[in-house]
């Protein structure tokens, strides 16, 4: 007697596996697609917090706030990533800091509490519209 020794997967089984992999990819890829953007944003927020600490240290030493990032280097303030542009703008009774991140970003506003800005007022443009990051 002769037996048929065919081994392997049928076309239907292979198609089912491909569909399952496609469904998993459709769920997983959007979940992790903006991971780099979120990490960059978290690093930028940490830079802003460190900048606020450095500004308060500078104020305690010289009775005024620093007007450039370079004035804070003696306090060992360094931006965590060279891909951002961090600037300080002197304001009446305080200062404003801006971080510009290259590339497309979804809208978000970070407001920190600082002296001279009670309640954490958001930064605004010339039209009074909150600046988005």
Regions found by a protein language model. Give the residues of each.
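Periplasmic/extracellular, small/polar-rich flexible segments of pilin-like filament-forming proteins
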Residues: 53-133
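N-terminal single-pass transmembrane signal-anchor helix
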Residues: 2-32
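Compositionally biased non-globular segments, especially hydrophobic aliphatic-rich helices
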Residues: 13, 42-45, 126-127
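Regular, well-ordered alpha-helical segments
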Residues: 26, 34-37, 53, 57-60
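Hydrophobic transmembrane-helix microenvironments that flank and shape a buried ionizable site
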Residues: 10, 44, 52-53
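Aliphatic-rich helix starts adjacent to a transmembrane/signal segment
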Residues: 31-48
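Short amphipathic alpha-helical/adjacent loop interface patches that line ligand
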Residues: 5, 48, 52
């Amino acid at each position: 007697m002769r037996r048929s020794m065919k081994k392997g997967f049928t076309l239907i089984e292979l198609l089912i596996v491909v569909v399952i992999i496609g469904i998993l990819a459709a769920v997983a890829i959007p979940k992790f697609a903006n991971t780099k953007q979120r990490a960059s944003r978290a690093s930028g927020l940490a830079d802003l917090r460190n900048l606020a600490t450095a500004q308060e240290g500078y104020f305690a030493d010289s009775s005024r706030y620093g007007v450039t990032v370079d004035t804070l280097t003696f306090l060992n303030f360094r931006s965590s990533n060279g891909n951002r542009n961090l600037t300080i703008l002197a304001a009446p009774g305080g200062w404003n800091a801006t971080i510009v991140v290259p590339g497309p970003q979804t809208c978000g506003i970070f407001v920190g509490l600082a002296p001279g800005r009670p309640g954490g007022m958001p930064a605004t443009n010339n039209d009074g519209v909150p600046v988005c990051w």
